[in-house]
Design a protein with these regions (language model features):
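Class I SAM-dependent methyltransferase Rossmann-like catalytic core
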Residues: 2-92, 102-115, 132-135
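A short SAM/SAH-binding and catalytic strip from SAM-dependent methyltransferases
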Residues: 197-211
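A short glycine-rich, Lys/Arg-flanked "PGG" loop and its adjoining helix->strand segment in the class I
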Residues: 211-227
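SAM/dcSAM-binding transferase cores
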Residues: 2-13, 17, 24-27, 31, ...
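Conserved beta-strand signature within the Rossmann-like core of class I S-adenosyl-L-methionine
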Residues: 198-200, 227-235
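The AdoMet/dcAdoMet-binding core of the Class I SAM-like
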Residues: 2-14, 87-194, 200, 215, ...
Length: 360
């Protein structure tokens, strides 16, 4: 897969430079390189409400966002990913953590499960520098040291660091595999090879990283699920949910925490605790907001994916789909008392050939 024109959004460039300096100093034999990097990183850490830390993304289209909600990075991992994954009671668990970042989702998962559970954790992170940040971060999570050990071992084998400081072995029941690669390449390679109880999908927001929320990406994720497995993501964006529907998966509301409620998807409908509301279903099915991201060659840049969707929305709006601006689909077959809103909704309806809100 060619990705020469593809640059994934990552943490801010100044943080990446801290990591690169750390690599250089340690390769030169400086035993204090890691301490220097930890000190330099302090200037960029963002403390969240639960006491855990996150970082800002690089600037894209004039804006930046944090890697985690400011309401609590670790609590978000627990409430939006680990708990709704329904891993309780399983003796063997396999989890795919896409855009694993600092490793919070994975370490929270380890802490949550019993010590006698056999756990296989596949972490996917395109940015080696972002993955390295786990070595420079402090976390109160008991199992975070296992993530740090796995990252340290991987970087040592790759020749990026010269010293190993984590001496304790990872417990025999915990198996951590790192994939430092474009997630699109990884999921294609895993098909026919592995099936997962849970897939944590945790990229930056859909408009920043649409390549990991496309029709095609969810089709590949679908093929990686066990029969009762779930895909979990923090976003409730309409194009993301539309792509899930297009892939043939059942979906529902994920738990709310900080940001709006997330999304849960599964092969089986009875795995979904809370179906989407009728309003959400209508907006996805009938408005231009429900046009999903598409990546037919499975190697496009985020710019091309966004442009493709924008063009499709423009062509469909007022022709085969309602404009999403006044949320016309949610008012179908209802009475509207607000005169101004009613005029706007009726104008939208007439563009598609309907006379009023109760037209057949």
């Amino acid at each position: 897969m060619k990705t020469s024109d593809y640059k994934a959004l990552s943490v801010e460039e100044k943080v990446l430079e801290v990591v690169r300096n750390f690599f250089r100093e340690e390769k030169e034999g400086n035993h204090h390189a890691r301490d220097h990097a930890k000190l330099s990183l302090q200037d960029y850490l963002v403390k969240t409400d639960d006491g855990s830390y996150t970082l800002n993304s690089d600037i894209l289209d004039g804006k930046s966002e944090t890697m985690h909600t400011r309401h609590g990075a670790v609590r978000e991992a627990m409430e939006k990913f680990v708990k709704p994954a329904k891993l309780d009671g399983k003796d063997n668990v396999r989890v795919l953590d896409i855009c694993s970042g600092l490793g919070y989702n994975t370490s929270t998962c380890i802490d949550y499960l019993s010590d006698d559970v056999e756990i296989e954790l596949d972490l996917v992170e395109i940015s080696k520098e972002t993955l390295t940040l786990a070595l420079l971060m402090y976390s109160s999570l008991e199992s975070y040291r296992f993530i740090q050990k796995a990252v340290e071992d991987e970087l040592y084998e790759m020749g990026d660091i010269k010293f190993r400081y984590y001496q304790d072995d990872i417990p025999d029941n915990i198996h951590i595999n790192l994939y430092i690669e474009d997630a699109r390449v990884v999921v294609k390679g895993l098909e026919g090879y592995k099936k997962y109880d849970a897939i944590f999908l945790d990229p930056f927001s859909p408009l920043k990283s649409p390549e990991l929320y496309t029709n095609e990406f969810f089709m590949h994720l679908k093929n990686l699920l066990k029969d009762d497995g779930v895909i979990l993501t923090y976003t409730s964006a309409a194009p993301v949910r539309a792509a899930i529907v297009k892939s043939g998966l059942h979906l529902g509301e994920g738990p709310s925490f900080g940001r709006s409620g997330g999304t849960v998807a599964s092969l089986k409908e009875d795995v979904i605790d809370k179906p989407l509301s009728m309003d959400d279903e209508r907006m996805i099915a009938l408005s231009d907001a429900g046009i999903p991201f598409k990546d037919p060659e499975f190697n496009d840049s985020y710019q091309k994916i966004l442009q493709r969707r924008d063009q499709e929305r423009m062509l469909s709006r007022g022709r085969i789909r309602f404009s999403s601006t006044v949320k016309t689909p949610i008012y179908l077959n209802k009475e509207l008392d607000d005169g101004r809103l009613k005029r706007r909704v009726l104008n939208n309806l007439k563009k598609l050939g309907f006379d009023d809100l109760k037209s057949p």
